[in-house]
C-alpha cells in the first residue's frame, strides 16, 4: 500500500500528516511504529490523521498517534499543523475551523502572518478528569519519585499533564525523572511531565517529557498546562499573553482563569511532501 503524507513541524515537534478524507487509511500500531522510525520510516513525534467529522456542525476530525503506535487525546503543536494542512491542501477555504478530538472540539484560526491560534478549550483539574489518583483537587500534589517528594500541578488539556517548577530547565532531571513520572502508578493513563522555569510573571522556559514519545523540542498542550499551572500557583499573570520558551522556539499562551479556554499561538511549517510504501 502506498501512502501519501506531509511532513510538518511546530517548533521542532514534528509530524507526519495523513489525509484520511481523500484516501482510506487504516493503520495498525505496528505500522505506525514503522512509519515513525527515523532510520527506516518517515520519522516523527506524532502521526496526525485528518478525517471527516462525526458531527455535521464541525469541519474535521483529528486523531493523534504517538511514534510508539498508541493513540492519544490531544496535541497542541499538532493542532496548528493540522489547521495549516487542511487549508493549504484545499480541504477547506476557512481560516477558522471546528475540529473534533477525542476530548472535545478545538477551534484553530490561521492568521495572515503564518501563525496559528488555537482555542484549546478550558483546562480540567479534577483528579478523575486527568486521570490522577488523589482524594481531591489541589493546586499542588505531592508525588514520590525516586525517593524524592515532588510538588506537581496536574492539568488536563484533553491529555494529562504533571507540571513542576524547577530552578533551571537546562539542569532539570528531565531524562531521569521524565519516564518515572510518565509511568507513575498514580497516573493510570500515564502522563506528560513538564519542567517549568519561571523567568517573570509573563515568561517561562519549559521542557516536556511526552507520554509515548520522550522529550520533544516543544509540546503545545504542555505549554498550555504549564501556564495554567503557573497561574494557579500565583506565579504568572492571568489574562495576559505568557511567552513560553521551548528548545524549539516560542509559543504565546493566554488563560483568563477558571471556566475560560486556553489560547495558544505559534507557527506551523510544512517541511516536505512524500509517499511511502507499507
UniProtKB/Swiss-Prot annotation:
Name the UniProt record assigns to this protein? Diaminopimelate epimerase
Q: Which InterPro entries match?
A: DAP_epimerase_AS, DAP_epimerase_DapF
- Which residues are involved in binding substrate? 13, 46, 66, 76-77, 159, 192, 210-211, 220-221
Q: Which organism is it from?
A: Laribacter hongkongensis (strain HLHK9)
Tell whether Flavoprotein is among the UniProt keywords.
no
Spell out the coiled coil positions from the record.
Answer: none
Q: Which cellular component terms (GO) are annotated to the entry?
A: cytosol
> Where is the site Could be important to modulate the pK values of the two catalytic cysteine residues?
161, 210
What's a Pfam family this protein contains?
DAP_epimerase
Entry keyword set: Amino-acid biosynthesis, Cytoplasm, Isomerase, Lysine biosynthesis
GO BP term (any one): lysine biosynthetic process via diaminopimelate
Write down the PROSITE patterns for this protein, in alphabetical order.
Answer: DAP_EPIMERASE (PS01326)
Self-association and partners: Homodimer.
Q: Which terms in the Gene Ontology molecular function aspect does this entry carry? A: diaminopimelate epimerase activity
Biological pathway: Amino-acid biosynthesis; L-lysine biosynthesis via DAP pathway; DL-2,6-diaminopimelate from LL-2,6-diaminopimelate: step 1/1
Gene this protein is translated from: dapF
Similarity field: Belongs to the diaminopimelate epimerase family.
Amino acid at each position: 500500500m502506498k501512502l501519501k503524507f506531509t511532513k510538518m513541524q511546530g517548533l521542532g515537534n514534528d509530524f507526519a500528516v495523513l489525509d484520511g478524507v481523500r484516501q482510506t487509511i487504516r493503520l495498525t500500531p505496528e505500522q505506525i511504529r514503522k512509519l515513525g522510525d527515523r532510520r527506516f520510516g518517515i520519522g516523527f513525534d506524532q502521526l496526525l490523521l485528518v478525517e471527516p467529522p462525526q458531527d455535521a456542525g464541525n469541519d474535521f476530525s483529528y486523531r493523534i498517534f504517538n511514534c510508539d503506535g498508541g493513540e492519544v487525546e490531544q496535541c497542541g503543536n499538532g493542532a496548528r499543523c493540522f489547521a495549516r494542512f487542511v487549508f493549504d491542501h484545499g480541504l477547506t477555504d476557512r481560516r477558522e475551523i471546528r475540529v473534533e478530538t477525542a476530548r472535545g472540539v478545538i477551534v484553530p484560526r490561521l492568521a495572515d502572518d503564518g501563525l496559528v491560534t488555537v482555542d484549546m478549550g478550558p483546562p480540567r483539574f479534577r483528579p478523575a478528569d486527568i486521570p490522577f489518583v488523589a482524594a481531591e483537587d489541589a493546586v499542588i500534589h505531592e508525588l514520590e519519585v525516586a525517593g524524592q517528594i515532588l510538588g506537581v500541578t496536574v492539568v488536563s488539556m484533553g491529555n494529562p499533564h504533571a507540571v513542576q517548577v524547577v530552578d533551571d530547565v537546562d539542569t532539570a532531571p528531565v531524562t531521569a525523572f521524565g519516564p518515572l513520572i510518565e509511568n507513575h502508578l498514580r497516573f493510570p493513563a500515564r502522563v506528560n511531565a513538564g519542567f517549568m522555569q519561571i523567568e517573570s510573571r509573563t515568561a517561562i522556559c519549559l521542557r516536556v517529557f511526552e507520554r509515548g514519545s520522550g522529550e520533544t523540542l516543544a509540546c503545545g498542550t504542555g505549554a498550555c498546562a504549564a501556564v495554567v499551572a503557573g497561574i494557579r500557583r500565583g506565579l504568572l499573570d492571568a489574562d495576559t499573553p505568557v511567552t513560553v520558551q521551548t528548545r524549539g522556539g516560542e509559543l504565546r499562551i493566554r488563560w483568563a482563569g477558571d471556566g475560560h479556554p486556553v489560547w495558544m499561538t505559534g507557527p506551523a511549517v510544512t517541511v516536505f511532501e512524500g509517499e511511502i510504501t507499507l
